[in-house]
Structure formats: C-alpha cells, structure tokens
C-alpha cells in the first residue's frame, strides 16, 4: 500500500512538471514553429555566399518551409529576400612581432518578407553573428582551413537566427 502511494505521488509530480513546462511555452532547442503563411515561400538571396544560401535552405526546410521557384508561385506566396552579407573584422590580439593573432569577425545582413507584388510585409530586419578567430599567425594553409570552417559555422548560425526570427513575424 505504502509503495503504491509513493509511486503514484512521483508520477503525479512528474505529470505536473511536464504540464507546467508545456504551459510556459517550453520548446525543444532548435524547434521553430513558423506561422502557416510562411510555410510556402520563394527565396531571393543576394547574400553573396553560396554557403549561407545552402545553410538557409536547409534551415528553412527543417522548419517545415516549402521553397518554390518564383515561376511556380501564386499571389499568396510570400518572398523572403536576403540582402548582401557584410563582414567586419576587429583585431583583438597581436604577437611579439606585431602580427595579428586573434580577430573578431562580425557578419550581418538584412532581410524582409515581400508580397508577390513586391510590397514589404515584414522587415527589414537585421541578423548578425560574431565569432573570435584564433591562430591567425599560423601557417597560411592552417589559418585558411580554420577560417573556412569558422565561416561555415557562422553562416549556419546566421541562417538559424533568420529562421528563428521568422517565428515572430506577425503574418
């Protein structure tokens, strides 16, 4: 009798905890619930980076968005337009021979949602990310390989930030 009371109490407390997490808007990390009007989009990217465009398409598809070509879109299909990505560097550290050893790189861009007739509905909104690049005084091939992998991660972060921000679009 006593054992079943303890088990019942534990299950009851666990159920209360689960319901309270759900009630407060708890979502799994990376899960995005986009408005239904944004589930079908056309994409116009002037980012200047194929790596970002690829990361953005992957992030949109993971969020449940179907991306149409503009020729297949109708008047109810919105267009996601991404402007050119800008990059800025700040030197953070130098070695004894005055060579840069650490750089903070910041990537930013603006995007907006347009109707089929070109009128903007949401935006322009800024997205940005920054990261510290170390080992800039290494050999050229090592630094290039490191920087390439870091840039790829930054583009993925930027795309994830854009998709996450779309979650709050009042459409």
For each feature predicted by the language model, list its residue ranges:
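Short secondary-structure boundary/capping segments
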Residues: 32-33, 72, 119
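C-terminal/domain-edge helix-coil "capping" segments
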Residues: 115-117, 138-171
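A structural "domain/chain start" motif
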Residues: 2-7, 20-65, 169-171
């Amino acid at each position: 009798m006593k054992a079943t009371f303890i088990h019942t109490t534990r299950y009851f407390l666990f159920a209360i905890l689960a319901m309270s997490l759900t009630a407060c808007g708890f979502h799994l990390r990376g899960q995005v619930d986009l408005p239904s009007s944004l589930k079908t989009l056309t994409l116009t990217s002037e980012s200047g980076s194929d790596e970002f465009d690829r990361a953005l398409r992957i992030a949109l598809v993971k969020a449940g968005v179907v991306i149409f070509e503009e020729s297949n879109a109708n008047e109810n299909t919105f267009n996601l337009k991404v402007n050119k990505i800008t990059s800025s560097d700040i030197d953070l550290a130098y070695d004894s021979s005055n060579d840069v050893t650490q750089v903070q790189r910041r990537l930013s861009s603006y995007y907006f949602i347009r109707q089929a007739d070109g009128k903007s509905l949401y935006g322009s909104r800024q997205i940005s990310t920054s990261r510290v690049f170390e080992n800039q005084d290494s050999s050229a091939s090592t630094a290039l390989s490191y920087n390439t992998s870091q840039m790829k991660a930054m583009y993925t972060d930027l795309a994830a930030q854009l998709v996450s921000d779309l979650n709050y679009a009042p459409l």
